[in-house]
Amino acid sequence: MSTCPHVTESHVFDFTAFLRDVCTDMIARLPELKHIELSRVAFSFVRSRKRTSHGTQATLTPMRFEGGASSGIVDGQRLTVDPLRTVDGREVLYLFHAYVPRFLDLSCEEKLVTILHELWHISPQFNGDLRRFPGRNYVHSNSEAAYDRLMLEFAQRWRAQEPNQQLLEVLSLDSARLQERYGRVVGHRIAMPRLVPVG
């Protein structure tokens, strides 16, 4: 059995711990991500219902509203997000979900672009809101293709800096090969936060 640090004594692979370590390494090497404080980002995995390459691979959920506001108007009602807390009681500002095995069955490059795509949604102010672009499509700008090209550039720059080879080795494995090598895939599972009325 491998000495991979994400494998527990009971021979299960901690996927969410691994994903956090990949993001930690990316933030350390890419100055565009320096604003992200990972201790206030929660990582979770969701079992994808169908084993297909189509569909959602990952999502980033902001825990606050526009501008970092603690509440906002939705369908005429003022709502807030049911809060998540870290183990030391700090407010979680973002929730990163990866859909397994769909995410795991992407190529290494596709995994990197997907992770960076979600991290880039985090506001430069790191205030619990999304990065907002001008225009109607404020989430991905007016050109989602340009957004994805930028993520590919980030991925290539990260790889060019020779990051931890064990991270790259695991990223190169699909779900079947990952389980064959390291054991059952486990991790934190956090439900999507609820919107609740203020007051």
Question: What function would you assign to each model-found segment?
Answer:
Residues 113-125:
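Active-site recognition of the HExxH zinc-binding catalytic motif
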Residues 110-116, 130-134:
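"Short basic amphipathic alpha-helical interaction patches in structured regions
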